[in-house]
Amino acid sequence: MDESALLDLLECPVCLERLDASAKVLPCQHTFCKRCLLGIVGSRNELRCPECRTLVGSGVEELPSNILLVRLLDGIKQRPWKPGPGGGSGTNCTNALRSQSSTVANCSSKDLQSSQGGQQPRVQAWSPPVRGIPQLPCAKALYNYEGKEPGDLKFSKGDIIILRRQVDENWYHGEVNGIHGFFPTNFVQIIKPLPQPPPQCKALYDFEVKDKEADKDCLPFAKDDVLTVIRRVDENWAEGMLADKIGIFPISYVEFNSAAKQLIEWDKPPVPGVDAGECSSAAAQSSTAPKHSDTKKNTKKRHSFTSLTMANKSSQASQNRHSMEISPPVLISSSNPTAAARISELSGLSCSAPSQVHISTTGLIVTPPPSSPVTTGPSFTFPSDVPYQATLGTLNPPLLPPPLLAATVLASTPPGAAAAAAAAGMGPRPMAGSTDQIAHLRPQTRPSVYVAIYPYTPRKEDELELRKGEMFLVFERCQDGWFKGTSMHTSKIGVFPGNYVAPVTRAVTNASQAKVPMSTAGQTSRGVTMVSPSTAGGPAQKLQGNGVAGSPSVVPTAVVSAAHIQTSPQAKVLLHMTGQMTVNQARNAVRTVAAHNQERPTAAVTPIQVQNAAGLSPASVGLPHHSLASPQPAPLMPGSATHTAAISISRASAPLACAAAAPLTSSSITSASLEAEPSGRIVTVLPGLPTSPDSASLACGNSSATKPDKDSKKEKKGLLKLLSGASTKRKPRVSPPASPTLEVELGSAELPLHGAVGPELPPGGGHGRAGSCPVDGDGPVTTAVAGAALAQDAFHRKASSLDSAVPIAPPPRQACSSLGPVLNESRPVVCERHRVVVSYPPQSEAELELKEGDIVFVHKKREDGWFKGTLQRNGKTGLFPGSFVENI
């Protein structure tokens, strides 16, 4: 078949003229020449397809060109055919072009469908037709073959063998005189070849296009779809057809059959100076320049792809997407639907099987998943100060890597990178790579030690089992609240929920060291501060930068957790607990409720460096009346020596009012009071008033002079009576739910107490947890932490104020390296309306049950991705993951 015969197949079904590059494709995928379409519009004032009568809404000039037709015409010009009856390169090139022209005819016109039967695939050997042979595919025996193994086909020279199938390039399966068997290819001469299957490929993953307008040249498909391969575009992309749509797709997403592999190898971009294969070297070199320009054009169109990064559970589309190089196809058979897309902060491509992704200087290389789904390498994140976008965007060729399983590989970003990613609309990518490959790009972060405060039973194979009190080394923290780390007891590595553990930091014993030993910022888990024992009756201890008193002793004896603290200058609040109580009972005894639906503003106490505030008077600040501390449960480590904990606060316009401590002994409990002087110094007063073995009191004061013992006893007695009356009216509390944080619930409205619950404090410094547990069977152990909350005059509200329901936001959380004072003012959080996009079943009593379409009023957004809000449907207030809702 010569070039003219090939071009005769490409004719307009209306005027039967030869189609050229100006031909237009209608939405029904039929192709006609532009002149005919203009004539139809001019005569009928509307455009309908001449074949299927489909109405076309756009003008002729707006219709797209037939890209396949244009490329086919270019291919004819670049690959001139070579006359000759033999099996030369011209014959093979012509056969390939005939195959492509048949595909164009199939999608362009029904009149040309009859031309498909004329295509003849390439074969290994050619011979003139032999008379008397059957019309079935057959071969002529060149030699006698006796067969060496059972199942081989025996034949003699000159026999006509009917071909059934080709086993591989060296063996056929055929039939002679009704006998079937195998025979070698080099013993026969092919007369009529087997019909070669069309070049096809099977989709291994889902391939979806996010921006249909920008990526209109791409061909989306689902897993297990069968595509017809047309040609190879460049090293990583191929062109194909699915149903009536034609477009490009990534080679690594499909598996080719033998015919498609030959076509892909044949269309592989030639290397300059090397023979390009079946076509002549001159033709290959002449086609190099247009090929590069075409590749560059397609590279622009294919630049805006992104893969799923997961974790992140909140789904945000990536605005600045990049393409990176991918290794040869990674064949992973499993596919995960897009349900996991909501948990990874990006919704790009659908999820697929887990695989490791290693970053190197040459690009992104995807390797098959290891035997264990948990990888030990730290996660990789782009540092915020390096312009990676410009660097990665210039990599060639573009990439669409196989999707990752976000539920298996969890990752996180450091605070700096997380902020940069959030600004760019991108979430952290759940990649796990080897340390040596990414160490030069990854900011160094120290692993943190955490202690399990609740037991947790793993639900997936990559999760760790948590036992209460067990220590863990955490080296990755995900934004959805999950941690990745290793158990210091079993040395197992895996992931576990971050709300089941609390950070452990050692108090600095050197008084001259002012650094705050806080855990990594961005974490809202409970803080556990280890302090050294102090000697009873010893001198007053100096406070460290984090507000925890320590002594030169080495052995830690107790763990004290700073609480959310509020107090009143008019009354010294006594927190009463008995050593015989259970953890829950002790927790209930010190938990306070806010009456009248939080009619008073909330002020937070943030642990900061001790500062001098000379000249400030305690009377210059209006504090809420009868505000009480709202401690939350925390584990206690057994100990017998006395220890003291204190929090020192200094603000620009307010004096400090203060928290204090309770020395613990196995037989008796003594009280300690902490007095605050106007100069801002904290003086710890060790053993004072004796109390009964089953109780302890903790007093808070703000006067600069020592009060008489009589007045203090009288005041304590009154407040003890007040507290005992409040405890009888308070509703019973249930056990702490396994939620990311325990929020203090509101009690009944008839309580005579007024106040609001203090917000959470940063981890590692002060945390809203306090509790007690018995050390041994006969000796009670009691701990209580109380403190003062500061409120500005501007935020003081009357009880009848209409805006009293608006909560006050906590002060901004301090970063690890930040030792500066907190902000002078708390800012109210405006309630935002959010719509539930994915239903969420609550995991504890503190969480809300979300149903798709519900409206939630968000009061507070936490750093770990959890929100606190009120459900419009039933009026309940609780916690829920922020990735399950969207702002409206």
From Swiss-Prot:
It is an enzyme of class 2 (transferase). The modification Phosphoserine is found at S304, S532, S735. A zinc finger (RING-type) spans 12-53. It is found in: Cytoplasm, Perinuclear region; Cell projection, Lamellipodium; Golgi apparatus, trans-Golgi network. Keywords: Cell projection, Cytoplasm, Golgi apparatus, Metal-binding, Phosphoprotein, Repeat, SH3 domain, Transferase, Ubl conjugation, Ubl conjugation pathway, Zinc, Zinc-finger. GO terms for biological process: neuron migration; positive regulation of JNK cascade; protein autoubiquitination; regulation of CD4-positive, alpha-beta T cell differentiation; regulation of CD8-positive, alpha-beta T cell proliferation. Its main location: cytoplasm. Residues 440-543 are annotated as: Interaction with AKT2. Residues 707-718 have a biased composition (Basic and acidic residues). GO terms for cellular component: Golgi apparatus; lamellipodium; perinuclear region of cytoplasm. Its EC number is 2.3.2.27. Coiled coil: none annotated. PROSITE patterns: SH3, ZF_RING_1, ZF_RING_2. Phosphorylated at Ser-304 by AKT1 and AKT2. When phosphorylated, it has reduced ability to bind Rac. Autoubiquitinated. Ubiquitinated by SH3RF2, leading to proteasome-mediated degradation. Residues 134-193, 196-259, 445-506, 829-888 form the SH3 domain. Residues 275-321, 516-549, 617-637, 693-741 are annotated as: Disordered. It catalyses: S-ubiquitinyl-[E2 ubiquitin-conjugating enzyme]-L-cysteine + [acceptor protein]-L-lysine = [E2 ubiquitin-conjugating enzyme]-L-cysteine + N(6)-ubiquitinyl-[acceptor protein]-L-lysine. InterPro entries: Endophilin_SH3RF (IPR050384), SH3-like_dom_sf (IPR036028), SH3_domain (IPR001452), SH3RF1/SH3RF3_SH3_4 (IPR035816), SH3RF1_SH3_2 (IPR035795), Znf_RING (IPR001841), Znf_RING/FYVE/PHD (IPR013083), Znf_RING_CS (IPR017907). Residues 292-362 are annotated as: Interaction with RAC1. Residues 305-321, 520-535, 693-704 have a biased composition (Polar residues). Interacts with HERP1. Interacts with RAC1; in a GTP-dependent manner. Interacts with MAP3K10/MLK2 and MAP3K11/MLK3. Interacts with MAPK8IP; this interaction leads to the PJAC complex (POSH-JIP or SH3RF1/MAPK8IP apoptotic complex) with a 1:1 ratio. Interacts with SIAH1. Probably part of a signaling complex that may contain SH3RF1, MAPK8IP, DLK1, MAP2K4/MKK4, MAP2K7/MKK7, MAPK8/JNK1, MAPK9/JNK2, AKT1 and AKT2. Found in a complex with RAC2, MAP3K7/TAK1, MAP2K7/MKK7, MAPK8IP1/JIP1, MAPK8/JNK1 and MAPK9/JNK2. Found in a complex with RAC1, MAP3K11/MLK3, MAP2K7/MKK7, MAPK8IP1/JIP1 and MAPK8/JNK1. Has E3 ubiquitin-protein ligase activity. In the absence of an external substrate, it can catalyze self-ubiquitination. Stimulates ubiquitination of potassium channel KCNJ1, enhancing it's dynamin-dependent and clathrin-independent endocytosis. Acts as a scaffold protein that coordinates with MAPK8IP1/JIP1 in organizing different components of the JNK pathway, including RAC1 or RAC2, MAP3K11/MLK3 or MAP3K7/TAK1, MAP2K7/MKK7, MAPK8/JNK1 and/or MAPK9/JNK2 into a functional multiprotein complex to ensure the effective activation of the JNK signaling pathway. The RING finger domain is required for ubiquitin ligase activity and autoubiquitination. This is E3 ubiquitin-protein ligase SH3RF1. It comes from Pongo abelii (Sumatran orangutan). The lineage of its organism: Eukaryota, Metazoa, Chordata, Craniata, Vertebrata.
